[in-house]
């Protein structure tokens, strides 16, 4: 299929980290991998009547704000903000918050400040990896991967700089274990790993086929994790949906303390991915409650 390429000038940043520009015929373009004041060539990934979406293929005139992403091959799959300095990211996010209030005719009394604990990388406590198998060689490879933004393709990775290091370490251990047992990517759906604030991890391996002893109790005990599960997930659904819990090893319940209260939660459950920042938001909200129940 022939690629649809457009050249345009980018004007601003919108929510989520896309840059916004206008095509020659007047249609708006929401672009991944671009910055304001850049002229770029984009590959159109979605073409609607009033707008297009696309991914930067070539930067013709680069912004002074552009930096080399920490994860150059996969950053668009995890955090499109990596192509700018942390201070620039904070500036744009503050401006987007202010703009959101202005759309509702609300003028904030004070300048917006974005709170940070200074951790740019290694802070996320949950990552969901896909799987990728290269069948071009004599032996099929097995890699953890992310979906490529704007396509159905996948990007093999060694982890992500945003995740707690223990998550990346565990993901590679599980990959190597499955590879040593000749497990093929087509039989696997996803690998979900979550850790608490001490770095203790729980994993869930979602599979699409019946794989007896894909991970044995002894193998699970040798992984750098407090526990894990093997889960059959309906292959008709792309989501990591729990159809049947096949095996469970160790302790699969994570535990964290926030403002003196202990929370226990499952690997697959919804919980904040950056607990120190979430805890600060709780402090801020508590200040406005005036000791009310």
PLM segments and residue spans:
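Accessory RNA-recognition modules of RNA-modification enzymes
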Residues: 1-293
């Amino acid at each position: 299929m022939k690629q649809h390429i457009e050249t345009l000038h980018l004007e601003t940043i919108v929510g989520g980290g896309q840059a916004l520009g206008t095509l020659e015929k007047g249609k708006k373009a929401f672009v991944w991998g671009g910055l304001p004041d850049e002229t770029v060539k984009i590959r159109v990934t979605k073409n609607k009547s009033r707008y297009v979406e696309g991914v930067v293929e070539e930067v013709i005139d680069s912004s002074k704000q552009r930096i080399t992403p920490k994860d150059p091959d996969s950053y668009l799959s995890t955090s499109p903000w990596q192509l700018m300095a942390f201070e620039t990211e904070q500036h744009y996010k503050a401006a987007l918050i202010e703009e959101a209030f202005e759309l509702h005719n609300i003028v904030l009394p004070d300048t917006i400040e974005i709170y940070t604990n200074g951790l740019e990388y290694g802070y996320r406590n949950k990552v969901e990896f896909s799987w990728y198998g290269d069948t071009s060689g004599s032996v099929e490879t097995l890699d953890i991967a992310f979906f490529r933004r704007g396509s159905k393709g996948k990007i093999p990775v060694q982890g992500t700089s945003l995740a707690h290091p223990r998550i990346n370490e565990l993901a590679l251990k599980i990959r190597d274990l499955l590879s040593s047992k000749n497990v093929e990517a087509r039989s696997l759906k996803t690998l979900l790993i979550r850790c608490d604030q001490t770095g203790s991890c729980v994993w869930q391996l979602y599979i699409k086929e019946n794989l007896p002893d894909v991970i044995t109790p002894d193998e699970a005990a040798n992984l750098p994790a407090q526990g894990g599960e093997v889960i059959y997930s309906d292959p008709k659904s792309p989501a990591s949906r729990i159809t049947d819990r096949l095996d469970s090893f160790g302790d699969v319940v994570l535990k964290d303390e926030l403002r003196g209260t202990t929370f226990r939660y499952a690997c697959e459950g919804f919980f904040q991915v950056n607990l120190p920042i979430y805890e600060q938001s709780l402090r801020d909200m508590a200040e406005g409650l005036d000791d009310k129940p």
